[in-house]
Amino acid sequence: MKKFLFLLALGLYLNVASAQNSKSITGIWWNEEKTSKIEVVEQNGKYVGKIVYMIPEKYENGQPPKDTKNPEESLQNRSILGLQILDGLTFNLDEKQWEEGHIYDPKSGKTYDCYAWFDGSTDKLYLKGYVVGIKWLGKSTEWTRTSLN
């Protein structure tokens, strides 16, 4: 009976620990160039991210830049500030990474499949965007944990 209770407690602990690990991606992140901050949150079991801050030097005529590179003409007038650029990431416990997501690059107007991971510290988030299903054909970037202010 003691062994059963111990295993039950251990199982519950590991389940809680893995759930906390999956949420470690949430928070505010500087992009690699330190021109934008992205907030990553959990939404319906998946992780999404939107641009919540842009350095003023990126503003055009005092306004945040528009999504002019978007291939959909109807979306080219929307602001990049507030734009969701990351969606659909789900945590893979075995691989210890977030997978099956998409990342939008407002500089090019292209959307890529992506996955994300930590390499030791949870202060640096690594993301790799790649062309449909070909993970080796892509580009990695590094985001740094920060705060909104």
Predicted regions and their residues:
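Bacterial Sec-dependent N-terminal signal peptides
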Residues: 1-21
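Tryptophan-anchored aromatic micro-motifs
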Residues: 22-36, 51, 100, 143-145
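Short beta-strand segments that buttress and anchor functional surface loops
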Residues: 29-31, 99-106, 127-130
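Short, surface-exposed coil-to-beta transition loops
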Residues: 34-37, 84, 109-114, 136-140
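Central antiparallel beta-sheet cores of small beta-barrel/beta-sandwich binding domains
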Residues: 41-113
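A mature extracytoplasmic/lumenal domain signature
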Residues: 42-44, 51-53, 118, 129-131, ...
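Short, compact, well-ordered microdomains
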Residues: 123-126, 140
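Edge beta-strand at a domain terminus
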Residues: 131-149
